[in-house]
Curated annotation (Swiss-Prot):
Root EC class: oxidoreductase
Name of the gene: fabV
Function: Involved in the final reduction of the elongation cycle of fatty acid synthesis (FAS II). Catalyzes the reduction of a carbon-carbon double bond in an enoyl moiety that is covalently linked to an acyl carrier protein (ACP).
rRNA processing among keywords: no
Reaction equations catalysed: a 2,3-saturated acyl-[ACP] + NAD(+) = a (2E)-enoyl-[ACP] + NADH + H(+)
Binding site for NAD(+): 48-53, 74-75, 111-112, 139-140, 244, 273-275
GO molecular function annotations of the record: enoyl-[acyl-carrier-protein] reductase (NADH) activity; NAD binding; trans-2-enoyl-CoA reductase (NADH) activity
Protein name: Enoyl-[acyl-carrier-protein] reductase [NADH]
Amino acid sequence: MIIKPKIRGFICTTTHPVGCEANVQEQIALTKAKGKIANGPKKVLVVGSSSGYGLSSRIAAAFGSDAATIGVFFEKPGTEAKPGTAGWYNSAAFDKFAKAEGLYSKSINCDAFSHEAKQKVIELIKQDLGQVDMVVYSLASPVRKLPDSGELVRSALKPIGETYTATAVDTNKDCIIEATVEPATEQEIADTVTVMGGQDWELWINALAEAGVLSDNCKTVAYSYIGTELTWPIYWHGALGKAKMDLDRAAKALNDKLSVTGGSANVAVLKSVVTQASSAIPVMPLYIAMVFKKMRQEGLHEGCMEQIYRMFSERLFRADGAKPETDSDNRLRLDDWELREDIQQHCRDLWPQVTTENLSELTDYQEYKAEFIKLFGFGIEGINYDADVNPYVEFDVIEL
């Protein structure tokens, strides 16, 4: 079939398998160009490995460090009549390129929050790898099915205490709007912590540790974002921030446990990037369009792949073997360039000046749109989008 982009809300409902493969190929090429990561991990589990930072982590491990990888994700395959999700095609492409280089690659399509997923991964590690020396936790899900009760809990991207009103961009109409978001209830805050906090990360690490499949020096990392006062009302000071603070709590508990044998657990605070996850957060697309333009001008721009490669090579797996630099809460900070005072001041000054008319001139909004559509495999140079493609793509994946 011939596949064209169809946007609804902040999701593109169609995906292009060839375009998604090209995205993965580009990230692999970028990793290889940067060179091998000295002291890198060799056996890596990535929970949430099909897009965004999770996918880049799997690529950094495999193509930057020749690691065997197991990827866990929840994606929909394509059929002959309908494309699958971008994450399915990303994972299929990763698997193809990893196997072509003789790298071990296994993938599990399942609900990562379930007990079954954890048991299956343990079984697979025991059978094929013995132990893993790195676990990346990179889930971004709006809903979690509690593994014991089966209850469905939903997260809320809302402020706390008062209604939040700010200038934002309507990405469908390409115009500047006033976005108003009502505050979260106590229940919504608690639910957001349940879905996006550190509880499931702890369940994963504890299950893996009890099964004896973590190496003594195993490192685990979970991803977070803090930002600055520009996005704090909706993010760090909102319901989502409470969940990310719970991630910090979990990191401390896990680090206390893993450090006994020489392992570690850290939250890595990353920069804002164009992902399916960030596009859903009110105000983030406009902020990203502003900050990206300034960071590009300063020569500091990084996408997911550059960020993660830097985290691997300059933080967790340093060539000199030294312990990574952390902040006072033991977090790895890779938002250091974005948070530079001149960059944040630029955004503070610019925010009130942005109108529908000058949006493309003052910010990287057009680039934001292009990067967003690229997540789904569209708008990539060298691909003929009028050509017939088969949306049904098979690969070596375990379905639970």
